Amino acid sequence: MALSRGLPRELAEAVAGGRVLVVGAGGIGCELLKNLVLTGFSHIDLIDLDTIDVSNLNRQFLFQKKHVGRSKAQVAKESVLQFYPKANIVAYHDSIMNPDYNVEFFRQFILVMNALDNRAARNHVNRMCLAADVPLIESGTAGYLGQVTTIKKGVTECYECHPKPTQRTFPGCTIRNTPSEPIHCIVWAKYLFNQLFGEEDADQEVSPDRADPEAAWEPTEAEARARASNEDGDIKRISTKEWAKSTGYDPVKLFTKLFKDDIRYLLTMDKLWRKRKPPVPLDWAEVQSQGEETNASDQQNEPQLGLKDQQVLDVKSYARLFSKSIETLRVHLAEKGDGAELIWDKDDPSAMDFVTSAANLRMHIFSMNMKSRFDIKSMAGNIIPAIATTNAVIAGLIVLEGLKILSGKIDQCRTIFLNKQPNPRKKLLVPCALDPPNPNCYVCASKPEVTVRLNVHKVTVLTLQDKIVKEKFAMVAPDVQIEDGKGTILISSEEGETEANNHKKLSEFGIRNGSRLQADDFLQDYTLLINILHSEDLGKDVEFEVVGDAPEKVGPKQAEDAAKSITNGSDDGAQPSTSTAQEQDDVLIVDSDEEDSSNNADVSEEERSRKRKLDEKENLSAKRSRIEQKEELDDVIALD
């Protein structure tokens, strides 16, 4: 029975008759879809580009083993209709960034709810909802931490009002089959440690994923591959740990299986390599027969500086380190007795040697630049697992905030943070007053404008298009023209129209210090004015930098005025917190679902938000604090 029967009549009618959009059918999306139909929502559009992976099954409860390889959106719809057949659900197996889903598409809905796992899609939906003037409920989880917030044009901050740290997210099949970044190999190496020496986890399998949907063009082929994988695993295979034990943890046999045989198997999945550079297997004997090489960083014409942990070695050295670490870990495991397990610790030298060597060997196989032990240690310590109960709590809060919006009580909406532990006031859920729009936001301001520092003699039009306009400012199909009185077109969204400009330097078009560019994305109904600040003093490997990010521009007086404006008429007397950085242990920023994206996730125990805490019993003065994101937390990862 739908809960709408207990709602006020007008709200119940809005719930039953209104059309809502859910973007994402993963960890949060499954819980949210279930909550919506049980609350009485009857007209739901659901969109997700992803397909179901085995690793999803432990928490994305609308999916079963038989669904592996199929569309998440379609299967979620089918599963929900089994227990609520009256619902009218439209499922799209597609990207929300497809131009078909334009402003008019978004205007069909009374409410949009995000259950996404990557920054680019979040930015895009944020802009589409602003353009369509449709309320958006944004959400995210990372481990035990979660967050829900409401975004409404002209009333609240938008998703991009304040810069966020780099998000890193990625699916399990990327880890096992098609790594493209060093962090993918580092995660794989940590999984391998647990498979060999620690507690085995089916979600941390390291062998090639034969059920990878990308390796099959048709869903039926993916399902057949999954069945073959399961049958083969049940009959012919034993666990990785049992196999390793049967070899006596022989380093050469382990090396051959992981870096030669498994890679050769990946190469048989030829569809994976049609648009990727294929991996190159390593042979133990060939590696050992190599002469002593210089360090990898020397090969890349970089000076060999710093401590030993900051040096990048050659393949032969990492192969030897791999062998030595296995021997040491085997002894440690034997000393603990039968049935014992080792726990990976980045401060354990042997465990760190193992992950460093295994990760670097895999990087070499997949044609990536290898990393130092120091870099790998910093990245390997920031991996966050997905937790089903966190997704469930956040999905419930999304619906509650949605009911407030449909009741016409958006002033009662809050940003709500879910904490790992109760705060000093014994609360796990901490509500915060919504902030008003940032007047300097380059997305939702009345006249979005930003300044970019770069070297006009070095930066190409292609860099401007891909790294600045698309990646940094999240445009999908930009048109860029120079404000030179002529309207010179620099970049066109029409394919091939300005391709000849790609490798030309900006200076070749008369762009210099003080030049202004107008970037338009007609899909997002978004225009951004870019001021060019020429500089020849950028740091090494820095192509550009955005000058004066929006949060840094907001002065104390502006912040105080904004705080007053949002508390006027509030029944609970919500006021900005006077808490110091050390006291705000209960307020956290979360920006990933449960996985890519990604990552990457944007959260840690040490991160704090600019939001204001609510406390019904205390009269707090209007003073805001902001905790700077710690640089070393940029690679916190949420895994799917």
From Swiss-Prot:
Q: Mutating residue 122 to G leads to what result?
A: In ACCES; loss of function; does not rescue the abnormal phenotype in a zebrafish disease model
State whether keyword Glycoprotein applies.
no
Recorded hits in Pfam families, A to Z, give:
ThiF, UAE_UbL, UBA2_C
EC number(s) per UniProt? 2.3.2.-
Q: GO CC annotations?
A: cytoplasm; nucleolus; nucleoplasm; SUMO activating enzyme complex
State where the record puts the cross-link Glycyl lysine isopeptide (Lys-Gly) (interchain with G-Cter in SUMO2). 236, 257, 371, 420, 540
Q: Which effect does the record note for changing residue 57 to A?
A: Strongly reduces ATP-dependent activation of SUMO proteins
Residue positions binding Zn(2+): 158, 161, 441, 444
Comp. bias intervals (Basic and acidic residues): 222-231, 551-563, 606-630
Per the record, which residues fall in region Disordered?
202-231, 551-640
**Covalent crosslink: Glycyl lysine isopeptide (Lys-Gly) (interchain with G-Cter in SUMO):** 190, 257, 271, 275, 611, 613, 617, 623
Report keywords, A-Z: Acetylation, ATP-binding, Cytoplasm, Disease variant, Ectodermal dysplasia, Isopeptide bond, Metal-binding, Nucleotide-binding, Nucleus, Phosphoprotein, Transferase, Ubl conjugation, Ubl conjugation pathway, Zinc
Q: Which GO terms describe its biological process?
A: positive regulation of protein sumoylation; protein sumoylation
- Where does the signal sequence lie? none
- Amino acid composition bias (Polar residues), ranges on this chain: 565-582
At what positions is Phosphoserine found?
207, 507, 592
Q: Where is the composition biased (Acidic residues)?
A: 583-597, 631-640
Give the position of the cross-link Glycyl lysine isopeptide (Lys-Gly) (interchain with G-Cter in SUMO1): 164, 236, 420
Q: What is the effect of changing residue 173 to A?
A: Loss of enzyme activity
Record annotation: effect of changing residue 59 to A: Strongly reduces ATP-dependent activation of SUMO proteins
What family is it from?
Answer: Belongs to the ubiquitin-activating E1 family.
The protein's job, in short, is: The heterodimer acts as an E1 ligase for SUMO1, SUMO2, SUMO3, and probably SUMO4. It mediates ATP-dependent activation of SUMO proteins followed by formation of a thioester bond between a SUMO protein and a conserved active site cysteine residue on UBA2/SAE2.
Q: State the associated disorder.
A: ACCES syndrome: An autosomal dominant syndrome characterized by a highly variable phenotypic spectrum. Clinical features include aplasia cutis congenita, thin scalp hair, dry skin, dental anomalies, ectrodactyly, and skeletal and neurodevelopmental abnormalities. Craniofacial, cardiac, renal and genital anomalies have also been reported. Affected individuals have early growth deficiencies that improve with age.
Please state what the protein is called: SUMO-activating enzyme subunit 2
